[in-house]
């Protein structure tokens, strides 16, 4: 019998209560034991590193605060909240972990911003470090580390633009306008992946 555990992020504007866990029976193709493991508002994007789960979101029934949270994945696959950083405004839409720099980076579609957060020695979310925001039609949709581990590459859906940020020694970000560039007008870039050799970037529009 082959079974795998999976976690599902959701919108909580309706009946959903947060992050769900399920068991997938890969022999039978069945989903079993669906249950709520973390009650948190709108955890719409999740990422996992080792025994940690990170999510975007906001407190339930309070969407005037938004941010990121970290959880321990326990031995029974339940989740235990270990850290959070919430700011005034809408929640981010995407979250990414950069383990080598003990850093979390989030992209905020509604607030037009890229935010960084520090991780403590246990890789739990500690404090907010920096925020970069535009004042134009920007809609920040995704951000990730470049293959050389020196820059943050962000996808600006609202401006059809790929933007580069330098990671400073204190893990704050500096915008590098001369390395940023526009995609085809109206293409709507949403995500970027790099080839294994680091020579190519693939943009999903």
Task: Please describe what each predicted stretch is.
Residues 1-2, 48-51, 97-101, 147-148, ...:
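Residue-level detector of Asp-centered blade-edge/turn motifs that repeat once per structural unit
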Residues 12-15, 59-63, 110-113, 159-160:
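Short glycine/acidic-enriched loop and turn motifs that connect beta-strands
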Residues 32-38, 80-86, 128-134, 176-183:
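A short beta-strand motif characteristic of beta-propeller blades
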């Amino acid at each position: 019998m082959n079974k795998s555990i999976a976690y599902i992020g959701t919108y909580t504007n309706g009946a959903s209560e947060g992050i769900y866990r399920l068991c997938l029976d890969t022999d039978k193709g069945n989903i079993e034991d669906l249950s709520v493991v973390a009650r948190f508002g709108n955890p719409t994007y999740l990422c996992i590193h080792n025994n940690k789960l990170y999510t975007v979101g906001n407190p339930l029934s309070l969407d005037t605060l938004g941010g990121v949270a970290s959880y321990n994945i326990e031995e029974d696959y339940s989740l235990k909240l270990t850290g959070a950083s919430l700011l005034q405004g809408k929640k981010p839409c995407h979250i990414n972990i950069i383990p080598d720099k003990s850093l979390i980076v989030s992209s905020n579609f509604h607030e037009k911003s890229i935010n960084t957060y520090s991780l403590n020695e246990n890789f739990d979310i500690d404090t907010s470090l920096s925020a970069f925001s535009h004042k134009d039609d920007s809609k920040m949709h995704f951000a990730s580390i470049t293959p050389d581990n020196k820059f943050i590459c962000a996808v600006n859906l609202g401006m059809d633009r790929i933007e580069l940020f330098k990671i400073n020694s204190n893990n704050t970000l500096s915008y590098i306008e001369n390395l940023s560039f526009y995609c085809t007008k109206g293409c709507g870039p949403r995500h970027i992946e790099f080839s294994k050799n680091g020579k190519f970037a693939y943009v999903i529009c």
